[in-house]
Amino acid sequence: IKHHFEPQLDIFQIIQFDAFSFLGTRKQLNLLWVLACFFCILRPFNLINFMHFKGVVKKMTTEFNSTINYFVEFENSFIHLNQFLDQEISINCFGYNCLSCSSAQPIFRQGFCKSCFFESPLAGEWIIKPELSKAHLNIADRDLDYEKKIQLQPHVVYLSNTGSVKVGITRKSQVPYRWIDQGAHEAIEIIETPNRFLAGTAEVALKKYMSDKTNWRKMLKNEIDNVNLLNFKEQAKTYIPSNLEHYFNVNSKVVKINFPVLKYPDKPRSVKITKDVEFSGRLKGIKGQYLIFENNNVLNFRAHEGHLFNISIKS
């Protein structure tokens, strides 16, 4: 279980020399291991008060609990961010790495370079517009095998309260993680369908009566409309196309979500980190895919997918 592990200290960044060329014997390797353990032992006593991580940014992974646990995962390490609330974090971008082709070209959208955004099956239009899914018809968009894998599995249409009630769609396997990523403090399933196309069709019908957007500023300020999602669920039932009514989830319950936030921003101000830009701030909370810092600064971590980040944490 992830939260049982402590973040790893990057010993090769603490000792400023080419460690790999230095290691010529097993004895020297053992010495370096002892030094790494020594630094880890000293850190709780504030004798070592900084940690360094670097890697390709992907969206934060989460663990559903009484309070959501957040993790930043890199290739050789990960950060349990909850441990570092109210501590100083510095981030700088030192390049790009496309999530599809791994090129160093600037990121265009969604973690992809421009070429991959328009060509990779990972960025097909049906991802944003589920009603365009065609795998159930055995018709390819960009890669039929991949599209079948994603589209031809159970999907859920839901209502979530991210400040106001909105309708959305996700794969069944992504419940409740999709709601966490949106910063919803509560959510409920409406219908469950066997594929993405049917769920997308239902969502299109519901969008005529309900919003499908999140007001990110309202969500981050924790301004929440006092609503009854069970009542909204029953109302939504009347908007579902008749050929999909039998997919209605009669027994679904409201799921409550609590985020690790010490202080919400009054006037959230979005921070963008591009190549050679550095940002520092005291971490005050995490909600959705946002890091909340002091002075109303917020960082949409997922919006930086494909960026190469150096992250330093000072306790």
What residue spans do the PLM features occupy?
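Hydrophobic alpha-helical segments, principally membrane-spanning helices and signal/leader peptides
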Residues: 1-3, 28, 146, 270
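Cationic, low-complexity basic patches in intrinsically disordered or flexible, solvent-exposed regions
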Residues: 3, 7-9, 17, 28-29
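Cysteine-centered motifs
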Residues: 37-40
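Non-catalytic accessory segments flanking enzymatic or RNA/DNA-binding domains
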Residues: 45-315
